[in-house]
Amino acid sequence: MTDDTRTRLVAALRGELRFNEPMARHTALKVGGPADFFAIPADPSDLQSLMAVILEMGMPYLVVGGGYNLLVRDGGFRGVVISLKQFCSMEKLPDNRLRAEAGSTNQQLVRFANGQGLTGLEFLSGIPGMVGGALSVNAGAHGRSVLELVESLTTLQGGKITVTFREDLRYGYRHLELKPGEIVLAAVFSLAAGDAEEIEGRIQGYLEHRRNSQRVGYPNAGSFFKNPEGKQAWRLIDEAGLRGCQIGGAQVSEVHTNFLVNRGGAMAADFLQLAQVIKSKVRERSGIDLEEEVRIVGVD
């Protein structure tokens, strides 16, 4: 990093800017080398100012939320990592709608909706991470996905804030089509009025299911691989005899085989090597190529 780069970024941001920030502090897997710059914008206009400088200088950048679905290599990230954790406002709108910013957690969103007597988002109960990340990967469970409920999406791309309505969104299984460099800022959800006790009952049911099936007990990024069409990744991994397989500090969970866990002292390289072993063994046994759901970034 140069003094000029540092000076320009500091001048552009009202929020916090850190230097050589270990990404292990900001990923659910607790691995990852240092980011050159780690920025925490105060609000969307602050992010716009920061992005204007980043784009002008042609710097690589990465937006993070709760650090789930993310693996940062041991060499870290050469550029600016941007945290949207300050973007956490939520509000009820007329006609059973709710607006939430990207830095709100999924659990805050579920609880806020319930508090407003709105139903539809209960299936997100227990899914870790933030709303921006859930939207970006079309997170879901129990046959539901979050983008099914989105009326509009607010994004920042090329320094311009844009609102895209449902009919113009392109999405699929664990995927939202975004333009290069487009950042999700907020969404408006179209929900339905419901009884608070019934909503709470569904929330508790989903939480209990997740506790029983996914309480893995160690740092993890959530599901590491996407489910191939008509198949379950965990079953393919289990059938390949990989339950409990361990490389360094990275292990295939004994509880849920699509969760790779940090048993302590793991490096990103351990997870990368373990992922390759899993893909090779599954391909060898079933002929199916697994695709990572976790995003892999950074340098070795």
Swiss-Prot record:
Residues at the active site: 174, 223 (proton donor), 293
Enzyme Commission numbers on file: 1.3.1.98
Natural source organism: Geotalea uraniireducens (strain Rf4)
Principal subcellular localisation of the protein: cytoplasm
Alphabetized InterPro entries for the sequence: FAD-bd_PCMH (IPR016166), FAD-bd_PCMH-like_sf (IPR036318), FAD-bd_PCMH_sub1 (IPR016167), FAD-bd_PCMH_sub2 (IPR016169), MurB (IPR003170), MurB_C (IPR011601), MurB_C_sf (IPR036635), Oxid_FAD_bind_N (IPR006094)
Keywords: Cell cycle, Cell division, Cell shape, Cell wall biogenesis/degradation, Cytoplasm, FAD, Flavoprotein, NADP, Oxidoreductase, Peptidoglycan synthesis
Family membership noted in the UniProt record: Belongs to the MurB family.
Name of protein: UDP-N-acetylenolpyruvoylglucosamine reductase
Annotated localization: Cytoplasm
Function: Cell wall formation.
Cofactor(s) needed for function: FAD
Any GO BP: cell division
One Gene Ontology MF term: FAD binding
Reactions it catalyzes: UDP-N-acetyl-alpha-D-muramate + NADP(+) = UDP-N-acetyl-3-O-(1-carboxyvinyl)-alpha-D-glucosamine + NADPH + H(+)
Keyword 4Fe-4S listed: no
UniProt xrefs under Pfam families: FAD_binding_4, MurB_C
Pathway: Cell wall biogenesis; peptidoglycan biosynthesis
